[in-house]
Each structure stands twice: as C-alpha cells, then as structure tokens.
Amino acid sequence: MKTLLFTTSLFFFMMDAGNLYDFKINALDGRQVDFSKYKGKTLLIVNTASECGYTPQYADLQKVHELYKDKLTILGFPANNFGGQEPGTNTQIASFCQKNYGVTFQMFEKISVKGADQHELYQWLKDKTGEEPTWNFCKYLVKPDGTVKFFASGVNPIEIVDEI
C-alpha cells in the first residue's frame, strides 16, 4: 500500500512539475501568449523593473537576444515587488523598454514574482529551483530537458551565454 501511495504521489508530482508549457500569460500589449510555443527551446526568464540599479541589464538582455535568438528565448516579466521600482502601467513599461533599450524580446504584463500574490509561473520556478527572486533582474535558465538554473540579479545576462 505504501508503494502504491508513493508511486501515485510521484506520478502527480511529475505531472505537475512539467507544466511550464501549460501557462498562458498576457504580453505587455494584452495578447495572450501560449507557452506551448516554447517547447524544445532554451528560455531565460527575467523579472524586470524600470527604476532599478540593474535596469541597464535591459541593454545586455537585448544584445544577448540579438546574438543568440536562434539558441535562446528571453522572456521579461516586469514586477513591482522590490522597492516599488516598477510603478508603470503595461503601456508605460512597453514604451520605456522600446525608447530606452530598443527591446524586441518578449515582454509580459506586470506580475508579482514573490509573496502571497506570486504568479503561478514564479511559483513553478521556485518549486523547480528552491530559489525565488531576491531583487529585480533575477534570472532562470530553463533548458529543453526541463532543468532550471537560478541566477541572482548581479549576474549579467552575457555571463549566462556559456550555459546555453
């Protein structure tokens, strides 16, 4: 009986652990993005903010996107969890990113990346790594095989290129 319960629990855990591609999240322009389109791709998921000391990383994220877009898909998630450093609306954030950094990688609507109202995607990332964002511009590298690696804010996106 214990073996059956363990096997059943493991089965449901494994089913839940693989649900990244079930997410549907709105982009900054309001269009829904189905994460199933990212199956088989290496992803770099980043929580962003417009008024942070790390905000210049947008330029490096864009550079990495331009150089490695055939190998790596960057997904940006604005969040106002740390110091109120992302106060803008989705429209204001989109304008800021385009005007100041020429961002062309996929940006999503503003979400919460930690706390009681943490978005399910970030709960999934936390469950996979045991790590959650400690500040803006934390990064998760998600490989096609399902492995996920966490990088702190101070790690420049260019430093992650060797991992892809």
Tell me what each language-model feature is.
Residues 3-13:
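Sec-dependent N-terminal signal peptides
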Residues 22-24, 91-136:
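Short, internal strand/loop/helix patches
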Residues 27, 47-51:
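Amphipathic alpha-helical repeat scaffolds
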Residues 41-42, 51, 56-80, 97-101:
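Conserved helix-turn-beta segment immediately C-terminal to the redox Cys motif
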Residues 71-88, 104-115:
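Thiol-based oxidoreductase modules, predominantly thioredoxin-like and allied folds used
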Residues 123, 127-164:
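Thiol-/selenol-based redox modules, centered on thioredoxin-like
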